[in-house]
């Protein structure tokens, strides 16, 4: 789906998410984790590590990545791809800020 036909949904304020933290939203059967970095960048990933489906929302946010709490896989917040020697990826979603409102791209 391209940006012109993308459906944007407000999922709350950036102030609802602590720096280096996350919040989850439901989308059908899927849970999407919304992450906020220390420098207020916001990212969205399916809340499922590509290794053993661990809850990424419960991981540690650092350096543009999140570390899965189950087996310490490091996942890029931008792409959803595993870093280092690990292979696999989780779905990443487009996200933007409109003032302080987090807009999640679905489609």
Question: What are the residue ranges of the model-derived segments?
Answer:
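Short cysteine clusters
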Residues: 49, 68-71
